[in-house]
């Protein structure tokens, strides 16, 4: 893997101490981190005692796997002990909470449970067809069904959040006491959400300086990628490590790409680090993904004073931004027009993006349907895996439960399967086992051969099945060379984003993607849970206040390399579009619209 060292990159590679790196979309920040890691690992080996290493963190397992695989590709070896690549949740949980939980009075030995369905069963007891809180919480039965206990999260400063409701002593004392009781119940039973674990870790490090000091000594170099998605308590933990002697800390991210405020991300705290004098403030503003006209479009959504982003080394196919107007109920027309443009320019990889899951129901998914296995099991497994990736945890667990019961009992034993699921389906142990299977599933990027083999091995080990499993891959299938198909990746036919095939997905699920073409659906009216044409700025001066809706559009548009297409209802007139997008290079398509008003 080649890595070009420009002036901006060189400045980052040479930086030590406390560094804030603001990296635009397509800047190659992950590649830069990977390049720098080798140098830091060598420095750490020379300058520090045995057993100390570099810690590189990000927010998802997928991001960590990307860092690890790129490191091996670039440097010819894996990152090994004493160096680590982990999610920030995993690091804090493993190195602080699970090691030192006993230092917190009243806390039971914890397990981390982020699945609402399992936490729900911890709180609610079923009786006579109803659900009731345990005796210790019975006084809050009236609140529990409106404000589900599994949704209660402590976010700092004596403030709780229940989905979109903020709760404090000042605005509702009884609801605040309910939240406190729920948190206390989780802690005393050792069933912690990730946000609970961050709170526990913060308290451990505050009260026991020696623990923070030992971690600062163990990892004298720390890099946090996607730092804009860090929560209040995670920032607090990093500061506690810094106070305990951590000498090298890098926060790498882009405040414009923070789209996880609903998961307690605090992008404004990340932004505040740019005002701290003891930190190095560096930038990567060379975009190696998108052509300049696309950059100019989404740059309108960045804050005032944010550095200019420049397309760097990208071949331009000279495709205008396409604004497609469609009549209500004719979303498919916009999709067809998008595909037509892509075919004309031979753009293979594509994304169709919407704000949320409710919009997905309006858009059909188009994929090539094949059935290479005789058994139904692998198709159900893939369905479960895709549901899990889409954060549809309950549906994924239900599907995996059925799969496990079937594999244990086989055909013709429906009553045994039903009893098995009835007895175990609501137990924490069974659901944790299912989650472990879902989290350990081989990626759909593997070939059919490798995925089939890896999945059968996982199921045999996970379910303690002694017999060999056989999904019965077909020997013949009309129109396909089966030997060639065996070596193709599963996600060519079953994945979220496929070559020449497009399925609609949410912007959140596409974060980190890089494709030839993007189609983004916007609404014509503003609303709490939608992004609309009205959310686009009228000029390129930058925004005084950047909101999550702006960041969502920014992230969606910045996935595109050559073609950006915006689909909007025909209630938005062509003249409104021209006024809004004045100064940008775009084309309006109103083909098929019943009435074109130019007001």
Region spans (language model):
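Conserved helicase/translocase motor-coupling segment
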Residues: 329-474
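P-loop NTPase Walker
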Residues: 1-103, 213, 505, 510, ...
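Conserved coupling/interface region of RecA-like P-loop/ASCE motor cores
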Residues: 257-263, 271-312
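Signature of the SF2 helicase/ATPase Hel1-core->accessory helical subdomain module
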Residues: 229, 233-270
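Coupling/switch/interface segments within P-loop NTPase motor domains and analogous charged loops
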Residues: 105-186, 412-460
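Accessory N-terminal region flanking or inserted into the helicase ATPase core
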Residues: 1-25, 31-32, 53, 128-220, ...
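C-terminal accessory regions
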Residues: 517, 523-599
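Inter-lobe coupling/hinge region of RecA-like P-loop helicase motors
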Residues: 2-25, 279-286, 304-353
């Amino acid at each position: 893997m080649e890595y070009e060292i420009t002036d901006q990159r060189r400045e980052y590679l040479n930086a030590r101490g406390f560094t804030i790196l603001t990296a635009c979309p397509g800047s190659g920040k992950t590649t830069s981190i990977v390049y720098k890691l080798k140098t830091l690992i060598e420095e750490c080996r020379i300058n520090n005692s045995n057993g100390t290493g570099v810690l590189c963190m990000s927010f998802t397992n997928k991001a960590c796997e990307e860092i690890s695989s790129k490191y091996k590709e670039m440097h010819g070896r894996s990152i090994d002990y004493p160096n680590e690549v982990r999610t920030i949740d995993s690091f804090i949980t493993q190195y602080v909470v699970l090691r030192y939980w006993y230092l917190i009075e009243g806390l039971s030995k914890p397990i981390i449970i982020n699945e609402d369905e399992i936490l729900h069963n911890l709180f609610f007891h079923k009786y006579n067809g109803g659900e009731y809180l345990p005796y210790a919480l019975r006084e809050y039965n009236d609140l529990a069904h409106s404000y589900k206990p599994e949704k209660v999260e402590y976010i700092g400063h004596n403030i709780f959040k229940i989905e979109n409701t903020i709760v404090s002593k000042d605005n509702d004392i009884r609801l605040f006491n309910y939240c406190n009781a729920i948190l206390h119940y989780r802690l005393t039973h050792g069933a912690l959400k990730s946000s609970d674990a961050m709170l526990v870790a913060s308290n451990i490090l505050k009260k026991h300086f020696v623990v923070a000091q030992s971690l600062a000594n163990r990892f004298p170099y720390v890099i946090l990628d996607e730092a804009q998605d860090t929560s209040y308590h995670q920032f607090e933990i990093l500061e506690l490590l810094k106070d305990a002697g951590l000498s090298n800390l890098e926060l790498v991210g882009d405040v414009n790409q923070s789209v996880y405020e609903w998961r307690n991300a605090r992008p404004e705290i990340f932004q505040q680090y740019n005002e701290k004098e003891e930190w190095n403030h560096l930038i990567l503003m060379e975009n190696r993904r998108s052509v300049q006209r696309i950059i100019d479009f989404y740059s309108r959504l960045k804050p005032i004073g944010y550095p200019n982003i420049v397309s760097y080394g990208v071949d331009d196919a000279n495709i205008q931004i396409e604004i497609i107007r469609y009549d209500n109920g004719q979303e498919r027309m916009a999709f067809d027009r998008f595909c037509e443009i892509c075919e004309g320019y031979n753009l293979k990889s594509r994304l169709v993006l919407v704000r949320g899951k409710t919009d997905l129901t309006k858009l059909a998914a188009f994929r090539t349907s094949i059935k290479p296995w005789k058994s139904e099991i692998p198709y159900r497994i893939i369905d479960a895996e895709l549901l899990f990736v889409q954060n549809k945890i309950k549906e994924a667990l239900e599907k995996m439960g059925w799969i496990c019961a079937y594999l244990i009992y086989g055909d013709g034993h429906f009553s045994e399967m039903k009893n098995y699921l009835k007895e175990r389906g609501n137990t924490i142990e069974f659901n944790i086992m299912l989650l472990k299977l879902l989290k350990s599933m081989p990626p759909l990027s593997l070939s059919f051969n490798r995925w089939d083999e890896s999945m059968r091995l996982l199921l045999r080990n996970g379910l303690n099945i002694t017999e060999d499993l056989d999904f019965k891959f077909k020997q013949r299938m009309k129109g396909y060379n089966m030997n060639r198909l065996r070596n193709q990746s599963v996600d060519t036919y079953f994945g979220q984003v496929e070559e020449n095939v497009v399925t609609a997905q949410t912007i959140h699920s596409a974060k980190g993607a890089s494709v030839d073409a993007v189609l983004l659906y916007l609404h014509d009216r503003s609303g709490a849970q939608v992004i609309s044409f009205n959310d686009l700025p009228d000029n390129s001066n930058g925004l005084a206040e950047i909101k999550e809706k702006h960041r969502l559009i920014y992230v969606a548009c910045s996935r595109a390399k050559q073609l950006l297409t915006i689909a909007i209802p025909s209630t938005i007139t062509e003249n409104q579009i021209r006024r809004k997008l004045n100064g940008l290079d775009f084309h309006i398509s109103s083909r098929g619209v019943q009435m074109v008003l130019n007001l």
